[in-house]
Amino acid sequence: MEISGTVLRQVSYVSGYGTHTRSRGLAPRFGVRMGMGSGFCDEGHLRYYQDTKKVLTPKKKLKLLKGFSKLGLASDPEKLAMFYDLQQNLTSDAGDVLLRELEAARAKEKEVKKKRKQEKKAKLKAAKMNCESSSSSSSESSDSDCGCDQVVDMNTFRAGVGVGVGVGVGVVAPAPVEESPLPKTAPIVEDANAHCVAMELCSKNDIYVSSASNGFKNESAVVTSAPQKRIEVCMGNKCKRSGAAALMQEFEKVVGVEGVAVVACKCMGKCKTAPNVKVQNSVDHNSLAQGLDDSVKIPANPLCIGVGLEDVDAIVARYFWESHTDIGMAGAGAATAT
């Protein structure tokens, strides 16, 4: 009994040797080696790189039908038959023909759209160029439209006039010519009432005065209202930022109420680093400047560009020299009286 018990124990120990719960589900290694050593089950990897014919899916063919109807290709009887064939059988070969037709029609439509876009772009470019040319021409012709005969740059004006300008008068008197003396004109006497009446008539719609007065005489007894002398200060955005309001106040201080109005005007189109001033002095070259050199003549209705506060006295003395001289003489007389 003891011998049989020991034999059973040894057999059970030997049979359980080397077993473990984790090693029960492992596959034998020789099976894996056999799987790795076998070849490809089919030749699908070779057919993948071959050129296959493009086959339309039913979804693409339905999309083709919609595009075919939109482009109006159904007007052709032959293509209409293909259209019906494709509607009945979406897997037919008629879809390939219609697809080529549709692609050609789409390419043609794209070409037409491209041409339209180019034409529209060319028209916009031409309109922009015309607008720029018209704006430049309008700015160049603004002097003639507003009655300006000459554009005066104040840098050149300061260099040429600043040396010969006196304290009271800002214009150099021309030397007398002995050979052809200027005809003397009798001064026109105006009283205060007639002057005020004339200024009121100037502000209205050029009313003609048929009755002659003591201050205004004419052979035909019809007198045209004379243009008013005034100084127009540009009030554009650029000129405002460069001190146009202060310049206008300075002109009002210097000119006063001696028949010269200081007003604001719209942008003149030549704004630079300083405000622009348009002078309406109504100079008549035929009667006042005959026989004078061009350098001595006073330009009528000039446009002064780049005007500063230091140029106010010079402009008033240059273009309104008669009234400025009267103002200076009146101030000097008042100073001597005191």
UniProtKB/Swiss-Prot annotation:
GO terms for biological process: lipid metabolic process; triglyceride biosynthetic process. [2Fe-2S] cluster binds at residues 234, 239, 267, 271. The keyword Transcription does not apply. Its cofactor is [2Fe-2S] cluster. GO terms for molecular function: diacylglycerol O-acyltransferase activity; iron-sulfur cluster binding; metal ion binding. It is an enzyme of class 2 (transferase). Keywords: Cytoplasm, Iron, Iron-sulfur, Metal-binding, Transferase. Its EC number is 2.3.1.20. Pathway: Glycerolipid metabolism; triacylglycerol biosynthesis. Disulfide bonds: none annotated. Gene3D superfamilies: Glutaredoxin. This is Diacylglycerol O-acyltransferase 3-2. The lineage of its organism: Eukaryota, Viridiplantae, Streptophyta, Embryophyta, Tracheophyta.
